[in-house]
């Protein structure tokens, strides 16, 4: 399957895994803050995405919106699961497919899900400072592609 193929490509790329783990080390210092930043960047970059999150209420309220906070935290733990599974194709497929189900249920297409790469790039840049580089963005984009293949 396409999912297995892409998951295998990520798991077998030592350089990308190093970049993912190193950058995750930075992103995960403040799980909630990073999750909220990523969501805010998504809504800025892709205003149409706001409509997909109508159930969360006023997303411009940021941290004051408990539903948005909850989603941001859950999102970060999903990323943690992906990073923890980088050495095991079957495990990576399992956690990605579980994550994908939530998005399939909300009718998020693979293309729509792919819109997260730009906001993720902005978030990485803000969090990593001088350590930021495009190879790190590419590594995360490879992981996003595994999710897209599951949608």
UniProtKB/Swiss-Prot annotation:
- Is Transferase one of the keywords UniProt gives this record? no
Stored PROSITE patterns: GLOBIN
Q: Which domain of life is it from?
A: Eukaryota
Tell me which residues make up the Globin domain: 11-151
Q: Which residues carry this modification: N-acetylserine?
A: 1
A molecular function GO annotation: oxygen binding
Asked if the Swiss-Prot or TrEMBL record annotates the protein with the keyword Isomerase, the reply is no
User: What residues bind heme b, as annotated?
Assistant: 103
Which controlled-vocabulary keywords does the entry list?
A: Acetylation, Heme, Iron, Metal-binding, Oxygen transport, Transport
Quaternary assembly:
Heterotetramer of two alpha chains and two beta chains.
Q: State the similarity comment.
A: Belongs to the globin family.
What's the name of the protein?
Globin-2 B chain
State the species of origin.
Answer: Anadara inaequivalvis (Inequivalve ark)
């Amino acid at each position: 399957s396409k999912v297995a193929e892409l998951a295998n490509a990520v798991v077998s790329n030592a350089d990308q895994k190093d970049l993912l783990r190193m950058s995750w080390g930075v992103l995960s210092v403040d799980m909630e803050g990073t999750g909220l930043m990523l969501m805010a960047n998504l809504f800025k970059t892709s205003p149409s995405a706001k409509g997909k999150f109508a159930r969360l209420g006023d997303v411009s309220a940021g941290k004051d919106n408990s539903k948005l906070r909850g989603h941001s935290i859950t999102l970060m733990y999903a990323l943690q699961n992906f990073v923890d599974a980088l050495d095991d194709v079957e495990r990576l497929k399992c956690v990605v497919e579980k994550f994908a189900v939530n998005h399939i249920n909300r009718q998020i297409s693979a293309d729509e899900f792919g819109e997260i790469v730009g906001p993720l790039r902005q978030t990485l840049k803000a969090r990593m400072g001088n350590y930021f580089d495009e190879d790190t963005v590419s590594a995360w984009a490879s992981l996003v592609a595994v999710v897209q293949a599951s949608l």
